[in-house]
């Protein structure tokens, strides 16, 4: 049984949204391929297999990006990490101590992490991602920094906006559920699931207000508005791969990241093949490949370090 968006995105009401980049190096010619047309998506990495957490003493600076290079990391084995416990009396907006612990959560490919922040906000951190946040929120804003992908269910607090910063994006909300995807900056989009958001970008002459079910795609200096099925954007935290009408390229990038495999297309034209495909994230890669291979026009082989689409 199946179990279950330099740019600024400001929420002007309760909303749910998705922001999306693709790695600049996602598509590159593979060295040593016998076929000239062979293309590799998402090379395999060797970054370890454990979810880790690093906690450091230091001042949390809302406007300066911090790089965590010191302090010891520890492996996280809990299915849910709760920072809300012991947070009484130290919520957002209370200065309290000037020094606050800074936490960096890191997930490898193939593993995700569910955590609850000190304000009660729930976060599902996807694989191959990093989330930096203060152990206790203080000041006018509740700010976190993300590299990768995470789904947020934000605790409502109209006096202290919740802010998700990425390298080229800032998303501000007052209390809602949304997904932020920021693995890279070559492609960007915002998808609104519910509520109302205003999107500002150097690519857009004036801010654009989205309606539920709309996605704003930004590629370089161009942008476009599309109507999409928003159901797919909430299913990851429920334990699914859900591709309602996605290209083989999009599907393979997701699978390669989750299972930490290089993805090779022997014929680039197959990257544009569209499929409807649903699977549980707990399934083995072999099971996923077998299911995909049963579809018309799909021929996939699984090697020890790569997935080959023929």
PLM features per residue range, with description:
Residues 4-10, 20-310:
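A residue-level detector for the "anchor" residue at the start of short, highly conserved motifs
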């Amino acid at each position: 049984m199946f179990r279950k968006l330099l740019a600024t995105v400001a929420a002007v009401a309760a909303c749910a949204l998705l922001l999306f980049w693709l790695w600049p190096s996602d598509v590159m010619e593979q060295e040593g391929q016998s076929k000239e047309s062979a293309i590799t998506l998402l090379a395999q990495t060797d970054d370890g297999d454990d979810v880790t957490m690093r906690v450091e003493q230091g001042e949390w600076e809302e406007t300066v990006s911090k790089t965590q290079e010191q302090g010891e990391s520890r492996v996280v084995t809990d299915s849910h990490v709760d920072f809300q416990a012991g947070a009484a009396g130290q919520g957002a907006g209370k200065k309290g101590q000037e020094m606050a612990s800074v936490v960096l959560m890191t997930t490898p490919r193939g593993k995700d992490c569910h955590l609850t922040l000190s304000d009660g906000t729930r976060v599902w951190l996807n694989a191959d991602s990093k989330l930096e946040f203060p152990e206790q929120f203080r000041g006018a804003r509740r700010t976190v920094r993300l590299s990768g992908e995470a789904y947020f269910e934000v605790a409502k607090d109209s006096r202290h906006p919740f802010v998700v910063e990425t390298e080229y994006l800032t998303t501000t909300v007052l209390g809602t559920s949304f997904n932020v995807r920021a693995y890279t900056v070559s492609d960007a989009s915002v998808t609104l699931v519910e509520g109302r958001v205003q999107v500002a970008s150097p690519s857009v002459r004036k801010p654009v207000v989205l309606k539920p079910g709309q996605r704003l795609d930004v590629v370089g200096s161009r942008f476009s508005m599309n109507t999409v099925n928003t159901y797919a954007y909430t299913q990851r935290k429920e334990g699914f791969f859900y591709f309602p009408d996605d290209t083989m390229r999009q599907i393979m990038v997701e699978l390669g990241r989750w299972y930490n495999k290089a993805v090779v297309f022997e014929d680039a034209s197959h990257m544009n093949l569209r499929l409807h495909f649903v699977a549980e994230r707990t399934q083995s890669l072999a099971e996923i490949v077998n299911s995909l291979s049963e579809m018309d026009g799909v021929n996939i082989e699984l090697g020890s370090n790569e997935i080959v689409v023929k």
